[in-house]
Amino acid sequence: PFLVYAFASGPEPGHTGAPGEKGTCTACHAGTANSGPGSVRVEFPGGENYTPGATQRLRVVVSDPDQVRWGFQLTARRAADAASQAGSFTPADANSQVICADSGLNQQTCSAATPLQYIEHTQAGTRSGTRQSAAFEFDWTPPSTDVGNIVIYVAGNAANGNNFNSGDRIYTRSYTLAPQAASQKPSIAAEGGVVNGATFQPGIAAGSWVTIKGSNFGSNTRVWQADEIVNGKLPTSL
């Protein structure tokens, strides 16, 4: 991503380091990628995998102890064919935008002629004056069917904010995501499926706790804090 003046609003497509691209952001920024003290990383909510058709909220973090302005560009490709787009992106806020290959236009739906999609920073997303790190969040929806492994390519720019290409630091990284089978729907047991949470017997009164027995339930938990118990009454929401 280019944070010289002309590209503060986001770079042209094709600078993530993916195969067949123009290179990385070092094409316009002096220096060698990954030579500074910082880094770029992508945070995946469920680990480095994907469920076909299931949208994930991804988070890109660019960090460098010395820098004060930030940018990124990211794309998703099929591992078996790096020229094939893998899913689609949707910005979560004004800090990122979607562009298509061979187009400087801000457009979320790419044509058949330019099917490769990128997500990158906007001018607002550069957050000039913010020190040490910046994060960008957006949604990625993988293909609706299993296409095998998917590779995420990302380049981050940790800039010094002088509006020139000197002193900026470029960081790159890639991640390979494996397909994950869609989880089965929860199933409540036929016998003793829903019972009173205190007595473990049938008969549910309004406002009471219940115990639900079955299979394929999620592993998430919820712990109530002391300040949530008011006048001896426990919370009734998760």
Regions found by a protein language model. Give the residues of each.
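Sequence context surrounding c-type heme c attachment/ligation sites in exported
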Residues: 2-141, 145-182
